[in-house]
Amino acid sequence: MSLKIRLARGGAKKRPYYRIVIADARSPRDGRFIEKIGTFNPLLAKDAENRVVLDADKAKAWLEKGAQPTDRVARFLDAAGLMKRDAKNNPKKGEPGEKAKERAKERAEKAAAGSTEDAAAE
């Protein structure tokens, strides 16, 4: 049985509220869970103390038992100091694509050709 520490959505339409739960990985997102270890209310301000409420002792115990946190829960656990989350780094994502590089190169060539013509005319 693979255990996950994940979010189970509750609340009304357009008013999300999440429980941080321990659940079998095969169970539905909002379905049966083993234990509730906290809550997350995304509607509160980011600096509000009630935005993420987490029982650190229970979370630590489940991590020691082998439960795997999802990405979002891993952020919460990292903020609480319970586990270290590696920073994601994708430097290629910020680079322009092939076509954009070609267009930029063409613009630079046109600008260079235009400035040499202006200098020759003077």
Swiss-Prot record:
GO terms for molecular function: structural constituent of ribosome. SUPFAM superfamilies: Ribosomal protein S16. Residues 83-110 have a biased composition (Basic and acidic residues). PROSITE patterns: RIBOSOMAL_S16. GO terms for cellular component: cytoplasm; small ribosomal subunit. InterPro entries: Ribosomal_bS16, Ribosomal_bS16_CS, Ribosomal_bS16_dom_sf. Residues 111-122 have a biased composition (Low complexity). Keywords: Ribonucleoprotein, Ribosomal protein. Pfam families: Ribosomal_S16 (PF00886). GO terms for biological process: translation. Residues 81-122 are annotated as: Disordered. The keyword Isomerase does not apply. NCBIfam families: S16 (TIGR00002). HAMAP family: Ribosomal_bS16. Belongs to the bacterial ribosomal protein bS16 family. This is Small ribosomal subunit protein bS16.
